[in-house]
Amino acid sequence: GIQALYYSYLYQMGVLKQKPKRISPVLRADIRKLDARIEQMEFLQKHQITTREELLAYRTPLEEQVQALTKERKRLYRSEPDGVRIGQINKVLKPLRKDIRICIRIEQQSREMEERMRLAEQIQRQAEQEEDKTEKTRQKETESR
């Protein structure tokens, strides 16, 4: 009917677009993780971390600090359970633990990303090799004619 005519006309003019193709599940999962990846990138830039060694060097003192504060807090829980210092320690521990978690995630996910990049490069090289082979066979076919 008329509605279909309008859809067809607007589509041909480029006003209406086709449905976007389905995104692969792997890519969809990566998109979901995008906010976390951005947060990790900002963390790396903020602390000027460029290698895993620097990441470990940043994380180690944090873990030692958390351990010392936890030990102090445990001692305070026994001696004065309602002390103000316990709340102060908890406020200091929260961002330290968050930074440690981010460091651990960066370390794990950077390895995963390296592996994905390696696989993508392999697939790209294989595709280029296949293209070269088909191009050579086409050239041979045209030369033999």
Regions found by a protein language model. Give the residues of each.
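Extended intrinsically disordered terminal tails
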Residues: G1-R145
